[in-house]
A protein has these predicted regions:
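N-terminal binding-site loop/beta-alpha segment at the start of enzyme catalytic domains
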Residues: 1-84, 99, 154, 160, ...
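A short, structured active-site edge motif that brings together acidic residues
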Residues: 80-94, 116-122, 192-195
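CE4/NodB-like, metal-dependent polysaccharide N-deacetylase domain
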Residues: 98-119, 157-161
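Beta/alpha (TIM)-barrel catalytic core signal, keyed to glycine-rich beta->alpha loops juxtaposed to Asp/Glu
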Residues: 121-223
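Acidic (Asp/Glu)-rich catalytic clusters
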Residues: 14-17, 67-81, 106-112, 181-184, ...
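Short, acidic/polar
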Residues: 33-47, 94-110, 148-150, 173-178, ...
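Conserved, mostly hydrophobic/aromatic
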Residues: 26, 46, 54, 66, ...
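A structural motif
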Residues: 51, 111-114, 164, 188
Length: 223
């Protein structure tokens, strides 16, 4: 029970496979404005308030600190692992080493599995932390369905190994989805997309729903 919100009263959506997920969660991207300690402190407060879904990512640079908050909450009896829905993502430079990335996130987040594991971006182009927003990687490559499916296959293996429960995709477009969906063995449970009143992406939203892929909006208040 949260101190301000009863988690059981939060509306839920149901994935195609029957998994229920809270409709409201907390993102943990601190950008350059908030330190890992500030973000993890906010996570601690959110858990006590009643939040049960947390959207993390390897590239955010704060999973270790957030994991300590999760561990403290488990140890103090504030919440059990089964009550949390923890999401994280493989970053662009780890597309060939997805299991390594996943295992590091599991270790950092102090949990024995990930509820929803995303491919953060559909291409392997890498930008170092702290780089200028206008910088360009000379080794950048365009989207390749073959490269993406190689990465996705590794995620499917993580499901088989019990490291993750569901696979997510992120920052996709309809043409990209049409190229890769027929090649997948395990259907993606969700697609994370920028979604707010100023950028509604209605066509993509409808496409995902038609294919039983749950849209998840990031930056819901705009950015």
């Amino acid at each position: 029970m949260g101190e301000f919100i009863n988690p059981a009263s939060v509306p839920k959506v149901t994935f195609y496979n029957g998994v229920e997920v809270p409709c409201v969660g907390m993102g943990t991207f601190g950008s350059d404005r908030f330190t890992p300690e500030q973000v993890s402190g906010a996570v601690a407060g959110a858990i006590r308030c009643g939040y049960r879904m947390f959207d993390c990512a390897a590239c955010y640079g704060n999973e270790d600190q957030i994991g300590q908050v999760f561990q403290d909450a488990f140890d103090e009896g504030v919440v059990e692992r089964s009550e949390l829905f923890i999401m994280t993502k493989v970053w662009n430079d780890m597309h060939e080493r997805v299991e390594e990335s996943c295992r590091k996130s599991i270790a950092d987040l102090k949990c024995d599995y990930i509820d929803l594991f995303f491919i953060h971006w559909p291409f392997p182009n890498y930008h170092a932390p702290g780089c200028d927003v206008d910088s360009r990687n000379p080794d950048s490559k365009p989207f390749s369905a073959e490269e993406f499916i190689r990465t996705y296959r590794q995620c499917e293996e993580l499901v088989e190994k019990g490291l993750i429960r569901n696979i997510g995709i992120s920052n996709m477009t309809i043409p990209k989805l049409e190229a890769v969906l027929p090649l997948m063995k395990i259907q993606p449970a969700a697609c994370e997309m920028e979604l707010h009143p100023c950028f509604q992406q209605q066509e993509l939203f409808d496409y995902l729903n038609d294919h039983k892929i749950q849209p998840i909006g990031f930056m819901p208040l705009g950015s």
